[in-house]
A protein has these predicted regions:
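Small-residue-enriched hydrophobic alpha-helices in membranes
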Residues: 1-143
């Protein structure tokens, strides 16, 4: 699990964070097992109330618009949501054009550096390679 600060955000910001991730699951009209696993992991980190979790699950079936998700998104929650949206989008091994466009829209809304998404994608690739090296190491430890 990522060392994180999502759980330190106010409850309302954690909810908006989770809604944006729910939106991202449907950007390309395809929800892979890897994306869902990442979504569930991040949702757990958000520490939402049972009622809020129920609302987020409804958003998975009928996602809000990106504009709705961005409307109440604070700076810190936005940066964390963008980071986790990048992780989710890349979790299936590729980031398609629709996903990349949505990520860029989020970064633009947050007024981040022009190369923010590119840098987050590079960081994600490095992180996934590091994780794979860990799995490879575990396999090499067997006799």
């Amino acid at each position: 699990m990522l060392p994180d600060t999502v759980h330190k955000l106010p409850q309302s910001e954690r909810f908006v964070y989770a809604r944006l991730l729910a939106y991202m699951t449907r950007v390309d009209n395809e929800l892979t097992v890897e994306e869902m696993a990442m979504f569930e992991q991040r949702l757990g980190t958000a520490l939402l109330s049972p009622k809020q979790r129920q609302m987020i699950r409804a958003d998975l079936k009928n996602p809000p618009s990106l504009e709705e998700c961005l409307a109440d998104l604070g700076d810190e929650a936005g940066r964390l949501a963008l980071r986790d949206a990048v992780l989710m989008a890349a979790s299936d091994g590729s980031v398609d054009e629709d996903e990349k466009e949505a990520l860029e829209d989020i970064a633009d809304h947050l007024d981040l550096a022009p190369d923010a998404v590119k840098r987050l994608l590079a960081w994600t690739v490095e992180g996934y390679a590091w994780m794979q090296a860990g799995y490879d190491l575990l396999n090499d430890l067997s006799r």
